[in-house]
Amino acid sequence: MVYLKNILIFLIIFLINPLVKKNKKSTKENDLKGPIALPIIGNLFGLRNDTYSIMDFYHKMYGGIYRLWFGDYFVVSLNDPEIIREIFIKNYSNFSSRPFLPTITFGSFNYRGISGSNGDYWKRNRNLLLNAMKKSNLKQTYDNLSDSVNSLINLMKEFQSSNESFQPDMYLRKYALTTMFKYVFNETVSFENKIVQGEEAELIDNINEAFNFMTLGNAGDFFKILQPLYYQYLLYRGGCFNRIRTLIRNRYIEHRKTIDIENPRDLLDLLIIEYGDHSDENMISIVQVCFDVILAGVDTLASSLEWFLVMLCNNQQIQDTVYNELKETVVGPVVTLNDRPSTPYTMACIKETIRLKAPAPFGLPHTTDQDIIVKGHFIPKDSMVLINFYSLGRNPKDFPDPLKFDPNRFIGSTPDSFMPFGTGPRNCIGQALGMDQIYLLLSNIFLNFKITSENGKKLDDTDYVSGLNLKPAKYKVCLEKR
């Protein structure tokens, strides 16, 4: 009996202590507010399956900055553009690091590359990548981009002429992949077949699986006692990461054998030249940099393309307005980047889609190196910091009636809170190419086709959690020739 009593006392203390620690009221006026945290798990309950709506609910309750507990980690959610810029532009050196979590450790190959690395190692990788990108053959990349657009449009015409329903997800990912393969490896991916198969299909599946592993709310990331076990689980189940790296490493080896430093063929050649000596560490860094570039350039971009088709399929009047603008503006049979300044409504539709369906709702987390007060809010050292892009785009203060799809919000000016690619030194360095890819494909699709659902009803536009990304459910559409 005494034994059971002691166990009960221990359990009560075990549960009460973290409950008090995580919810104690501070006398400091600048301490962050947030929801009550449960013992041990904190605020993790329910997050994995409904992350975005729960975090948006907290934003409405606690404002532009609030605190949470993810297991053992004190988390700060940023939802105010002024605070975000204060942190990641004026104080970026204190917030530039990534937290040490099993998922980031594994996904970045032990904090290498560009997305997951820290400190001087990150600065070196970023600078070398930027140097390589400045020297890359953009004409070659954009010529291939135009070819990819034309190839996909022609493939869609085959579906249209045969009255087949078109399921866009794999084709949009293949489109994104073609640009990355040309840019990084100087390889051309063919659109000849209606079925996406072989190495391309396998790589697309591996990229999708890798993003799913990065879901916010993994218990193994946020309980320190579980982290070693979770890392072993990732080693066992996370073969998708290694399969992608193996594909890149094989191309690295081939490039090393055939490189002409006077005539670099692609980004991989330029990275080999920029890194200099051919040490194993430099090889690993280059492979991981390419890994980061390809993942960021395929899945998030394809998700934005998918959402755009959903939103315009569900808003036929807006779709017709886009078509009329393109028809009146475009001189030739295809839309080019030169047409973009003359098609503001089409661009507004793209921005409105990205606002409402943020491609990376939280991105990757940051961590604080030192205690700091930002805009009157105290953020302690070792806090995990998230930019809540999802709530930024749905703040009624900046976007009245935020759930309504209304491209007119972006006619004339762009609100300060529209920052889907981040801000500061760790923002997305490929955003210009990404926006060009989106504009070229979508404008040409809607110049050529009227898109409707199979049954005449609206497509499901529910937000689906998929790792780091927000994706729609799989869907099919009917293509009608314009």
Swiss-Prot record:
Sections of the chain in a coiled coil: none
Pfam families attached to this UniProt entry: p450
Transmembrane segments: 1-21
Gene3D superfamilies xref list: Cytochrome P450
InterPro entries the UniProt entry points to: Cyt_P450 (IPR001128), Cyt_P450_CS (IPR017972), Cyt_P450_E_grp-I (IPR002401), Cyt_P450_sf (IPR036396)
Subcellular location: Membrane
Record family assignment: Belongs to the cytochrome P450 family.
PANTHER family linked: CYTOCHROME P450 307A1-RELATED, HEME-BINDING MONOOXYGENASE FAMILY
Name of the protein: Probable cytochrome P450 508D1
UniProt source species: Dictyostelium discoideum
Gene from which this protein is expressed: cyp508D1
